[in-house]
Amino acid sequence: MNEDALFKVLKRQTKATLLELLDSAYYEMNTQQRRHIFGALMEESKPAKAIAREIKKESEEFYQESIAGIYYAPFAMNSKNFSHIPEETEEWFEKLGDLLQASTQVAKQKEHKSAVESFEILYQLIEKMECGEEIIFADEYGSWMIPGNEQDFLDAYISSLADVKTPEEYTKVVIPLLKRDSYTSFCNKVYSLAVKHSSKAQESTLKAAVKEQKIKTTSRR
């Protein structure tokens, strides 16, 4: 297709026609192409108000689909294609990132109970992915592939936990997040976030558990 001729035709189209073409083009793209074309635009956009019950429902559906293997797309790997990442894997991370971002917005709206419910579902799923369950497929994959800033997601999650959980409940949820952070050189500073958002009672219970279980909270380097 001749590029110059195409753009001359496009310049003569109405806004409605261009939007219709853009809509069609979006659905012809794969996940990576959409991120490349529209990613910067989405980062600049203001987040829309999230409907908490819808986010929870979407998170539950995404969890069930993932467990059922909807996004698991294995292929015969060899020396030529080992770096290939299936579209299903790309789509899974994109959907996960969208739901984490939406849950963060729910937390910012001070709907902390609903935010916690969604975050708990998503982080259970992340744990299963990191443990190697057959949810997605690639030679190498991990949480670094989640779009967005995970520290922001965790900040929202932990702040909501602090608002709705007892000291014992708070500690029970935060401890696995602390251990997970230690595996990634404390890149998300989970302990600092947990102390920042906790009440005195929550902080005391958490610190006692950290000491008892001898959990590292910062890098020694």
Task: Give residue ranges: language-model regions.
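Residue-level signal for short amphipathic helical patches enriched in basic/charged
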Residues: 13
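Eukaryote-biased, non-catalytic alpha-solenoid scaffold regions
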Residues: 4-8, 16, 23, 27-221
